[in-house]
Regions:
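Long, charged amphipathic helices and adjacent flexible linkers at domain junctions
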Residues: 294-312, 467-498, 611-656
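Generic start-of-chain signal for non-secretory N-termini
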Residues: 1-31, 38
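Accessory alpha-helical DNA-binding modules that contact the DNA backbone or grooves
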Residues: 42, 54, 58-158, 496-638, ...
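Duplex nucleic acid-engaging cores and interfaces of nucleic-acid transaction enzymes
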Residues: 2, 58-64, 71-331, 335-439, ...
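A glycine-rich phosphate-binding loop feature that marks nucleotide/adenosyl-phosphate handling sites
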Residues: 191-198, 332-336, 393-397, 418-425, ...
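Low-complexity, acidic/Ser/Thr- and charged residue-rich accessory regions of DNA metabolism proteins
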Residues: 153-164, 220-221, 256-264, 269, ...
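Long, charge-rich intrinsically disordered scaffolds of nucleic-acid metabolism proteins
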Residues: 108, 416, 422, 427-497, ...
Length: 733
């Protein structure tokens, strides 16, 4: 019973702390969000269908409240645990209780607990067992008496204290540990190091860095307070690979002098020098290394959090790229000797045909001669309108080949380069084997390349998000944290768009709010066994899809051309009565959803009356109206599509000052990589993204953006292109 009370108290205190911390939200919003989450509602459901209650908070804001509450509840529980552990030792005082109450970080809590923690056997504990604690206390009194004479009284052969020196050394160990355990000294020295410390790196084994990736860190330093996150991760990686040694250096003369002044009451005492030595020893062996570890951990955690956030933002923009609807697409997985694999998909993603051609060096002359004709025949046979070329090995040679062939086709067929990051991971996965059991791995890749252009979201959810190529130092961040963030991003993106329940794969459905891997598979099995769903109510018959899961999921599951037109919208069934009443009031029951006539009919409605009649807020009313007026809405259609090309651009043709259009492929701390149609993506450094100060590249560009760039530097030998998004006319203005 006691445990339950404690848990409730910790939860309640954590809620109060969230309100005090996250002042950008009203207390009522925080209570509402946490209440809805406790009732088993999902983040996407709350964000879309409970806007009236939350004040239109989005998924990111809801998750921020959820995560902060969870962290603070664990923090409060740790506080209670420390209080209990100290109390069990009979050492809990009002001062300690007050200090615990004031603590706002885990570091502060652990500093308070440190003196009471069960220690492993140290030199200080051995010295205490040898009876030297009274001697240590005497030394701290800094009397005028002789240290040697006092030390002699503690010689004890049985306890291995054989000399005066042994006694003094033992007492120094005890004093050093006491000082190390003082929370206030650790706090002072930690803050001093954070403010004045310098992160330094020196080369350790240069031969391990063959490509000179870490050359700038061979002799490098940067203040702790201003070091940027991506350099922290680069240093960590260089250190992990044994290329450099990293330390934090700081001159602690001033703070140690203050400790000395506080501890040494009588500087002329014979014991003063010994106490001073103990203070230095305490810092050198205990406090200093611990603070260095803590600060490096803090810097790493901060850098990892940012790297995860950037990865999440890049992934979101990648998933929400515009789909290429209504196109017959030929996917081409490039290769030299083994041939380019081709796969054609129709407007729905169904595979129409596949083939292999050998247009490149490595294949026989005869095969190369046949490749062009084979390619053109396939394009004509299936009515291909768009070619998707993977950006891997032989990509640019394949682009040249495709451009040459398309010039010989009388009608307009265009191509684009598609990132094939993760295509090989997908091709060898269980999902791919289930979809295409009789295909070779490379043939599956060609299908994936075509489909990820046609519907990026539906295809990319089949791949581990870590494999899609938009991360930064993703192997240097905690996997659990990264997975949680990426799962959240995928879930948010899928629910933002919604899915057609009659065509969606289980891999896509499992990200719908309220569904799991099992229930998603059950939806597909039910569909296969019983035919297409004709209304949303049928979803209730799916095994293991209970009332709560149905409530959470149904609004995100669309049934196109079903028996109820509302089922093709994102209006939730709980609001169908509102939708029917709106149409009745406007005498528009027979008008098609999304039609100009319906839009006209709804213009004159008194929305205030509707809200009062149904007891709903403005947000729910707007959601219903949007569903009636834009039934097939897809937020991705507002995003610019990929750059479609009909001719190739060679690296050699680039010139400094040349203006180009490109696609942002990756955003990192120091800039953005842009595909301009040559072999290597060009880098737009953060300083070249726009005029003026840029806090982070993601404030200016996002993955998938189409941008205008100018070539600022070329290195054909290294295949490097530097770009700028600041036009020549704005350079000096």
């Amino acid at each position: 019973m006691t445990e339950q009370t404690t848990e409730i108290t910790a939860y309640e205190r954590s809620v109060a702390l969230v309100k005090a911390e996250l002042t950008q939200y009203k207390p009522k919003q925080i209570d509402t969000v946490l209440g809805l989450l406790q009732d088993g509602n999902t983040v996407p459901f709350i964000a879309r269908y409970r806007k009236d209650q939350t004040g239109s908070l989005d998924e990111v804001q809801i998750r921020e409240i959820e995560e902060r509450q969870r962290y603070l509840e664990n923090f409060e529980k740790r506080k209670e645990e420390i209080s209990r552990l100290i109390d069990e030792q009979g050492k809990l005082t009002p001062e300690i209780t007050a200090a615990l109450s004031k603590a706002t970080t885990l570091t502060a809590l652990e500093d308070i607990y440190r003196p009471y923690k069960q220690k492993r056997r140290t030199k200080a504990t051995i010295a205490k067992e040898a009876g030297l604690e009274p001697f240590a206390l005497w030394l701290l009194m800094t009397t005028k008496d002789s240290v040697e004479e006092k030390a002699a009284t503690f010689i004890n052969e049985e306890k291995a204290i054989l000399t005066v020196e042994d006694a003094i050394n033992g007492a120094v160990e005890i004093i050093a540990e006491w000082i190390s355990d003082e929370a206030k000294y650790r706090k002072q020295l930690r803050q001093f190091t954070q403010k004045n410390g310098v992160v330094k790196s020196v080369v350790k084994k240069e031969e391990l860095d063959e490509k000179k990736v870490y050359e700038m860190y061979y002799d490098y330093e940067e203040p702790v307070k201003s070091i940027v996150p991506h350099r922290v991760l680069a240093l960590n990686r260089a250190e992990k690979e044994d290329v450099v040694r990293v330390t934090i250096e700081v001159d602690v003369t001033n703070p140690l002098t203050k400790i000395k002044e506080e501890k040494i009451k009588n500087p002329s005492s014979p014991s003063a020098a010994i106490v001073e030595g103990a203070i230095k020893e305490s810092y050198k062996r205990f406090i200093g290394p611990a603070i260095e570890r803590e600060i490096r951990n803090e810097l790493s955690e901060k850098a990892q959090t940012q790297a995860i956030a950037i990865f999440g933002e890049n992934l979101k923009n990648l998933l929400l790229q515009a789909p290429m609807k209504g196109q017959v697409i030929l996917g081409l997985d490039p290769a030299y000797r083994t041939g380019c694999k081709l796969a054609v998909i129709d407007e729905t993603g169904k595979v129409l045909g596949k083939s292999v051609i050998y247009p490149h060096v490595g294949a026989s002359e005869a095969k190369r001669a046949q490749a062009g004709g084979q390619f053109r025949r396939i394009v004509e046979q299936y009515g291909v309108t768009l070619v998707a070329i993977g950006n891997g090995t032989a990509s640019r040679e394949s682009e040249q080949f495709v451009a040459e062939q398309l010039r010989q086709i009388p009608r307009k067929v265009v191509y684009t380069i598609v990132s094939e990051a993760g295509a090989s991971v997908y091709s060898a996965s269980d999902i791919a084997r289930q979809e295409f059991p009789d295909y070779q791995v490379e043939e599956r890749s060609a299908v994936s390349i075509a489909r990820r252009l046609q519907d990026p979201l539906a295809e990319l959810v089949k791949i581990d998000p870590k494999a899609v190529g938009v991360g930064q130092y993703q192997h240097d961040v905690p996997e659990k944290q990264l997975d949680e963030q990426l799962d959240f991003v995928v879930e948010t993106a899928v629910n933002k768009v919604g899915v057609n329940v009659n065509t969606a794969s289980a891999a896509l459905l499992e990200h719908i709010a309220g569904l799991t891997k099992t229930t998603a598979a059950n939806v597909v099995t039910f569909r296969d066994e019983n035919g297409k769903f004709t209304n949303r109510t049928q979803l209730k018959k799916v095994p293991r899809l209970g009332p709560k899961a149905y409530e959470q999921a149904v609004g995100f599951l669309r049934i196109i051309d079903g028996t109820n037109p509302f089922d093709g919208t994102d209006i939730h069934p709980e609001s169908y009565d509102v939708a029917i009443a709106i149409l009745k009031k406007a005498n528009a029951e027979k008008l098609a959803l999304g039609s100009p006539e319906l839009e006209e009919a709804l213009k004159g409605l008194n929305t205030k009356e509707l809200k009062e009649e149904f007891g709903i807020g403005q947000e729910t009313l707007e959601l219903v109206m949007d569903g009636l007026l834009k039934p097939g809405r897809d937020p991705r259609e507002e995003v610019a599509g990929p750059i479609l090309r009909s001719d190739v651009l060679k690296m050699e043709a680039l010139q400094v000052g040349m203006e180009l259009e490109g696609t942002v492929r990756n955003v990192v701390d120091f800039g953005a990589f842009v595909d301009i149609g040559v072999k290597q993506d060009g880098l737009v450094h953060i300083s070249k993204l726009k005029k003026g100060f840029v806090k982070h590249p993601s404030d200016v560009v996002a993955v998938g953006d189409i941008v205008t760039v100018w070539v600022t530097e070329l290195d054909l030998k290294k295949g490097r292109v530097d770009l700028s998004m600041i036009g020549p006319e704005n350079k000096n203005s």
